[in-house]
């Protein structure tokens, strides 16, 4: 067969992104094939070149120890707001206590952010003391403890909770990784209504399996997203 060239296709991607959970590595395969032109963009516009986020991200990518010196330059009385802080704790339980304090009080007050939607905890694991499951329960109990809700598979979902869609649902037009907020619930009929960016989506019964609390999410789930403030527990 033959075809007529009528345009071009660009395939942007992040070469340092975590590999897919499933099969396939399209971007790296295309680059390694040497059969298409490749352009590498290395100027960061989101942060300044001397940003500690930028500096430490490059260090981690190269397998080097991050620069924690910025944490020693900041005091509570300083007016200057830095973009990277390192806080050391002695054990996982203390880390959880610090996360609760930082995400609900210190960061929102100092940076004038909403603790519900502007601050995001990113954790490497689902399970464990500093895993997403435990942190979601702890954060929910502090940020949204008393709102009306329903229990589903040993998890409470309350009006006002931040939640994440866990799978693609083409009928509801919500997709894996979408963040929303519960705006209504009916415990008797096991129904939830979630406000996403463009629509309110209805869930009932087993459909609630598609949702999880999103006060804390895994690093893998966060790829492609951006947040005003991020807390990352490392043990």
Indicate residue ranges for each PLM-predicted region.
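Loop/turn-to-beta-strand initiation segments
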Residues: 6-10
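Conserved nucleotide-binding/hydrolysis modules and their immediate coupling elements
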Residues: 136-235
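Conserved RecA-like ASCE ATPase "motif II neighborhood" in helicase/translocase motors
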Residues: 1-5, 217-220
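Conserved helicase motor core of P-loop NTPases
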Residues: 12-163, 169-172
């Amino acid at each position: 067969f033959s075809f007529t060239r009528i345009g071009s296709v660009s395939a942007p991607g992040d070469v340092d992104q975590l590999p897919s959970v499933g099969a396939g590595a399209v971007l790296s395969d295309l680059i390694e094939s040497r059969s298409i032109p490749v352009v590498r963009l290395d100027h960061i516009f989101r942060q300044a070149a001397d940003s500690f986020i930028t500096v430490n991200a490059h260090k981690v990518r190269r397998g080097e120890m991050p620069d924690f010196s910025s944490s020693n330059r900041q005091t509570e009385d300083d007016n200057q707001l830095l973009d990277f802080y390192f806080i050391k704790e002695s054990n996982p339980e203390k880390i959880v206590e610090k996360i609760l304090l930082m995400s609900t009080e210190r960061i929102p007050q100092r940076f004038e952010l909403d603790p519900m939607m502007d601050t995001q905890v990113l954790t490497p694991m689902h399970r464990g003391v500093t895993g997403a499951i435990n942190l979601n329960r702890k954060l929910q109990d502090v940020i949204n403890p008393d709102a009306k809700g329903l229990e589903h598979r040993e998890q409470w979902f309350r009006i006002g909770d931040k939640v994440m869609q866990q799978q693609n649902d083409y009928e509801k037009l919500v997709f894996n990784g979408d963040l929303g907020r519960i705006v209504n619930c009916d415990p008797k009929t096991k129904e939830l209504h979630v406000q996403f960016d463009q629509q309110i989506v209805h869930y009932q019964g087993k459909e609630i399996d598609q949702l999880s609390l999103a006060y804390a999410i895994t690093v893998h789930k966060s790829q492609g997203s951006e947040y005003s403030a991020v807390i990352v527990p490392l043990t």
